[in-house]
A protein has these predicted regions:
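C-terminal catalytic "cap/lid" subdomain
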Residues: 2-76, 80-273
Length: 273
């Protein structure tokens, strides 16, 4: 039996605390530079959610690509050196762009750079959680990214999908929205004419057989990574949505017109009362 629902679950009542993860393939142009127009459109939507009384946490990739666009390196660097150099320059550019874009809505943002170790040690975990809670309580949108400049390769997150899932669980979010360059999880090869988006998947169903391991051209993640994160987070009682960040007003449409908006929803395990 096909391991998914055949129609969308009604998510008209959108959630109060939302973690939105946006990948490099959404934020980056074909030439490898940041797509400021798309970043602006994303900020417009996040500001709209804030206006409608939703708490927003943004997990944003793009620092490495932003740094690569700023530097002309005339000698060979290994992958670790590239990541450290480009992210050290690019993270500042990325957060400044977000700061300027959100300022048009009089919304304050704060930068949170984290590492996997911060989720493994209890004291660091609680400190990080407290920091982000105080930001939200004071109307500040946390913008989270991995601290690539100091992370050891063996202790890095798989990608920002994994990071966003950990953030959603730590912050007890109502929903995690993973924005990529695809409309959701397909029930086959997306290039085949009869392939369709799987609209809804229960937290305990396996759809990995339908997913290829194509990685983002500008990031470390792929659909298998998103699927793993989505199922883990949904199993923890948090709704997960995979949608296309290149679609105009995708976040607003998920709130206002969920039944008509292409996406895959991972239905959360009911939380114990």
């Amino acid at each position: 039996m096909f391991p998914a629902l055949t129609q969308y679950v009604n998510i008209k009542e959108f959630m109060r605390r939302i973690v939105v993860k946006v990948g490099s393939n959404v934020l980056t142009r074909e030439d490898g530079h940041l797509n400021v127009t798309r970043m602006s459109a994303l900020v417009d939507q996040l500001a709209w959610l804030r206006k409608h009384d939703y708490e927003v946490i943004l997990v944003s990739s793009g620092a490495v690509m932003a740094g690569r666009g700023e530097l002309q390196v005339d000698h060979q660097l290994d992958s670790v050196e590239q990541r450290q150099l480009f992210s050290s320059v690019g993270q500042g550019k990325l957060i400044r762009l977000y700061y300027d874009l959100f300022r048009e809505y009089n919304i304050k943002v704060g930068q949170v750079l984290t590492m996997k170790e911060n989720f493994l040690a209890k004291e660091q975990y609680q400190n990080q959680k407290a920091c982000m809670n105080i930001m939200l309580e004071n109307g500040v949108i946390p913008i989270v990214n991995e601290n690539d400049t100091v992370c050891l390769t063996e202790l890095m997150f798989t990608d920002n999908d994994e990071l966003s899932g950990l953030i959603a669980q730590m912050m007890n979010a109502d929903a995690l929205v993973l924005l990529s360059n695809v409309d959701g999880v397909y029930n086959g090869d997306p290039n085949e004419p009869h392939t369709r988006i799987i609209p809804s998947v229960y937290y305990d169903r396996d759809v990995s057989e339908y997913v290829s391991d194509d990685k983002s051209s500008h990031g470390r993640g792929g659909m298998i990574s998103k699927l793993k994160t989505a199922q883990e987070v949904a199993n923890a009682g948090i709704k997960v949505i995979i949608a296309n960040g290149n679609t105009p007003n995708i976040l607003i449409d998920l709130k206002e017109h969920p039944m008509e908006t292409l996406h895959t929803e991972f239905v959360a395990r009911p939380k114990e009362k």
